[in-house]
């Protein structure tokens, strides 16, 4: 029962975390070409989403993931798909902090023009890493069992 609750919490938090990361990149790129005051508002909104949505859900996803490993008494380490998923989770975690640094830079500058090209690349990287992580769980788990 505990494992089921942790799994549901993990999936929900991942959806909200990844969705918020993509939303941040969309907010920043939406401000490109606008007046400086409008760009400053877009940058502030992106920072607010990062602080109030993305970071808390990242923490919940991380804690529920470690909770699942602990509740299963390390069983996941025997499965090859878990190692791929864990590696991709670390990549997404790193992208989270890179995205946060870019958002802070945009807010400090009061403009989104300078970080918009990086945001497009970060958006693609987050989506690809998330899709590959889902592929590790669904495809490899189905093929190899567990």
Identify the role of each PLM range.
Residues 1-146:
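Polytopic transmembrane helical bundles with strong interfacial aromatic enrichment
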């Amino acid at each position: 029962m505990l494992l089921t609750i942790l799994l549901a919490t993990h999936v929900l938090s991942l959806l909200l975390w990844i969705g918020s990361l993509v939303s941040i990149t969309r907010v920043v790129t939406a401000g490109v070409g606008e007046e400086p005051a409008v760009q400053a508002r877009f940058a502030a909104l992106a920072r607010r989403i990062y602080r109030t949505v993305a970071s808390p859900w990242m923490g919940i996803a991380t804690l529920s993931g470690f909770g699942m490993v602990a509740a299963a008494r390390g069983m996941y380490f025997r499965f090859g798909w878990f190692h791929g998923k864990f590696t991709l989770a670390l990549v997404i975690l790193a992208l989270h902090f890179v995205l946060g640094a870019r958002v802070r830079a945009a807010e400090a500058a009061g403009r989104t023009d300078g970080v918009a090209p990086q945001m497009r690349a970060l958006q693609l990287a987050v989506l690809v890493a998330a899709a590959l992580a889902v592929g590790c769980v669904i495809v490899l788990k189905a093929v190899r069992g567990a």
